[in-house]
């Protein structure tokens, strides 16, 4: 079964929009144990070092980038379930995205959509998709096809 404590989100920069902060708070409550860490934005090389240095040996790094693999919500849930008990860190870039170094270091690059979203919104969308993935795994009526 999927457990929110297996997931960490590393995100560059702060969320400045209150409505996004409010949305994230909703999903933090729905996903107890989900960790969201903000990394100070600035030089993309420093951001990259901060992301890569925070990954533990037993964690998988998943980079969110527009050219990444695309999933349906069902496929995303099944993919997460198939990872077993692995701890997963999702890296979300700031205004300049993620460096090639982070993308190359990642175990996988995924895309939330063919559309481009502000990095603050990407956090909220990812949190919702993690909640949806867990709901699918539990057979909850939250996800409807």
UniProtKB/Swiss-Prot annotation:
Root EC class: transferase
UniProt subcellular location: Cytoplasm
Major place of residence: cytoplasm
Molecular function, one GO term: rRNA (pseudouridine-N3-)-methyltransferase activity
E.C. number: 2.1.1.177
Superkingdom of origin: Bacteria
One Gene Ontology term, aspect cellular component: cytoplasm
Catalysed reaction, written as an equation: pseudouridine(1915) in 23S rRNA + S-adenosyl-L-methionine = N(3)-methylpseudouridine(1915) in 23S rRNA + S-adenosyl-L-homocysteine + H(+)
Pfam families (alphabetical): SPOUT_MTase
Quaternary state and interactors: Homodimer.
Function: Specifically methylates the pseudouridine at position 1915 (m3Psi1915) in 23S rRNA.
Family annotation (HAMAP family): 23SrRNA_methyltr_H
Family: Belongs to the RNA methyltransferase RlmH family.
Designated name of the protein: Ribosomal RNA large subunit methyltransferase H
Species of provenance: Prochlorococcus marinus (strain SARG / CCMP1375 / SS120)
Gene expressing this chain: rlmH
